Amino acid sequence: MNLRLAPAAERAKSLVSALFPPKVRNILKAVWVVLVTVFVVRYMVRNWGSITDVFRSFSVAVLAGTVAVTIIGKVVISVHSQLITKVNGREFTFRESFWMYSASDLVKYVPGGLWNALARVRLYTNMGMSGAASTKAFALEKYWMVLGALATGALALTPDGLKALGVSDAVVTVSVTRVLLCAAWVVLIWAGGRLTGNAVVAGAVARSMVEQSVMAVFLGLGVWIPLQAVDANVSPLVAIGAFSLGRGLGYAAVFAPAGIGVREAVTLWAIGPTDTTTRAVIVALAVNRVMTFVADVTSFGLSFTVKPRPNGDT
């Protein structure tokens, strides 16, 4: 039964390729990067004086704290990738998973289409996974990451979302809504595994939900810390939820390398009104983006120091 479901994933992949062939994706990415760059440069030139004032709010402790919690979030992501390869029939150690995730994640900054995917699949196959299993594992990881980011964002922002829809945000209403969201999340996690041709046991579903929630907390704190520095007075839960939605839609935006621009725009929208200016919030999100890059490079360095050597030395 599992094998009969696997072609559905191939059909979905073919549909995406038909709608966004590699050349189209590359063109869209190039256009998007140019647009974002022009917007950022124009915005900075026009608002340089006030931007420099905001930058003074970010102490070394704020920057270091942002990098630290982001690295922890990325460690959790590598643990989650360990679960996904296990679902696809191959168990890796934490050191192996941390290295493969960090090395391939850094490649997302290289211009082009699918370097991140190609790097991960190559690393998996070098470690003994078949090409088919490696491709399925990476596809399932991306699906679960998008799903988990959107789910944790919706759960964190349930009260705000209900109020925006004109629905009561009473405790009972919020609780019932969150239960329904969790139920949908469980079903979609299970469905994702089945579409790759692999059965996903209840323990794997529960572990995925826990790990996705933990990574959402730490990655979201990477936004909350800079927001606190500019006196935005945003609660940690709102920052976590807003950034989770931004991450989810950023992952899904095939035209935006590393979700750049999309992640920030969605996060800004989801945060809503604050006690500071919109400009200060935008600068805080920009600081998060830069510190995320620093965290990516640092994670790569850490993973390189602990990665297993070919001769088996530790």
Language-model-derived ranges and their functions:
Residues 84, 112, 134, 140, ...:
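Residue-level signal for inorganic ion chemistry
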Residues 106, 140-143, 248, 290:
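Transmembrane alpha-helical cores of Major Facilitator Superfamily
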Residues 1-102, 149-253, 262, 273-314:
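Predominantly cytoplasmic-facing regulatory/coupling regions of multi-pass membrane proteins
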Residues 94-99, 116-118, 125-142, 276-287:
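Membrane-interface alpha-helices at helix entry/exit sites of multi-pass transporters
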Residues 53-56, 86-89, 116, 120-126, ...:
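Short amphipathic alpha-helical coupling elements at transmembrane boundaries
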